[in-house]
């Protein structure tokens, strides 16, 4: 017989971890289910050494540091954590929800979905023979191992710009983007323009030059032109973003806006008792940032507590008054 939880949180990224901690502070019985092999979501797995700029009060905070702080905060409570476990169905029963997963089943009074963009994998570089090259990378692990190496980065979003600025401190760095304008925070773009990073726009990669195992040069072609250039490099980083999959979400019977769960001001979905927070939810004016999701977590938790027991106030005491 499965234990009955007050709140089951689907997703163990930053927003899910904070929601679990906050739920414990409301003395709820909580568990976390995550399809990934470790806690922390994208910041922990894809950006462990990248600085995160939208967590107030913590300058120069990396994805790994954020994850470790949230886990440390949660470790003060007993929280069952189910990793490598994918939620398949969420069924409403008389007084609780039955969650069917790839490994079993769970009973819970309420559900908070904090699954971000879902399962993710990097958008690949689509050039001939790309699979064989060992020095083409899609994420950064231990940035110091690239010190003094010639680094080239492909992409024009926040990740590409931020990594270019990070690599510039330790290595000769080139950034290639197919457009003249970057899709990144204005402050970061200004810092890039004032940096020593070699910027190649509007160029796109056109040919890999190497022995099939080690890439030595990258040919780039100017957009809408036959003009080409060749870049010498030791490592190539592809920052084209990620393909996300929400998996079985569409089968959970919730109203969606494209692939996001529509919520009201309580962070409640179209099914009473099921809430959504972070990048997986949608409402008018929604901004996808870690900081936004962290703020949505207490709203969902407090309303879940009130759903379980209407005698419990939605507005709790402030932690400073406890």
Curated annotation (Swiss-Prot):
PANTHER family: THIOREDOXIN REDUCTASE 1-RELATED-RELATED. Its EC number is 1.18.1.2. This is Ferredoxin--NADP reductase. It holds the Pfam family Pyr_redox_2. HAMAP family: FENR2. It is an enzyme of class 1 (oxidoreductase). FAD binds at residues 34, 42, 47, 87, 120, 279, 320. The lineage of its organism: Bacteria, Bacillati, Bacillota, Bacilli, Lactobacillales. It comes from Streptococcus pneumoniae serotype 19F (strain G54). Keywords: FAD, Flavoprotein, NADP, Oxidoreductase. Homodimer. Binds 1 FAD per subunit. The keyword S-adenosyl-L-methionine does not apply. It catalyses: 2 reduced [2Fe-2S]-[ferredoxin] + NADP(+) + H(+) = 2 oxidized [2Fe-2S]-[ferredoxin] + NADPH. GO terms for molecular function: ferredoxin-NADP+ reductase activity; flavin adenine dinucleotide binding; NADP binding. Coiled coil: none annotated. Belongs to the ferredoxin--NADP reductase type 2 family.
């Amino acid at each position: 017989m499965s234990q009955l939880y007050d709140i089951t949180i689907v997703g163990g990224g930053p927003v899910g971890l904070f929601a679990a901690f906050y739920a414990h502070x409301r003395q709820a019985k909580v568990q976390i289910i995550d399809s990934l092999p470790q806690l922390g979501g994208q910041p922990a797995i894809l950006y462990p050494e990248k600085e995160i700029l939208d967590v107030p009060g913590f300058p120069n905070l990396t994805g790994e540091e954020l994850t470790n702080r949230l886990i440390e905060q949660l470790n003060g409570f007993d929280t069952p954590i189910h990793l490598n476990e994918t939620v398949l169905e969420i069924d409403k029963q008389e007084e609780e929800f039955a969650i069917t997963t790839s490994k079993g089943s769970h009973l819970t009074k309420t559900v908070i979905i904090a699954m971000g963009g879902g399962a993710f994998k990097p958008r690949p570089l689509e050039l001939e023979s790309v699979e064989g090259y060992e020095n083409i990378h899609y994420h950064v692990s231990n940035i110091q191992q690239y010190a003094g190496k010639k680094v080239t980065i492909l992409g024009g979003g926040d990740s590409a710009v931020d990594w270019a600025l990070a690599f510039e401190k330790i290595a000769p760095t080139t950034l290639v983007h197919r457009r003249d304008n970057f899709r990144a925070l204005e402050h970061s773009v200004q810092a890039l323009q004032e940096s020593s990073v070699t910027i190649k726009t509007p160029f796109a990669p056109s040919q890999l030059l190497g022995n099939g195992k080690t890439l030595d040069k990258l040919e780039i072609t100017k957009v809408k032109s036959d003009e080409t250039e060749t870049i010498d490099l030791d490592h190539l980083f592809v920052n084209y973003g990620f393909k996300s999959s929400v998996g079985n979400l569409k089968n959970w019977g919730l109203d969606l806006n494209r692939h996001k769960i529509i919520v009201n001001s309580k962070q409640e979905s179209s099914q009473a008792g099921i809430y959504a927070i972070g990048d997986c939810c949608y409402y008018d004016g929604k901004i996808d940032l870690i900081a936004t999701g962290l703020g949505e977590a207490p709203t969902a938790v407090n309303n879940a507590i009130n759903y379980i027991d209407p005698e419990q106030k939605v507005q709790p005491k402030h932690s400073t008054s406890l």
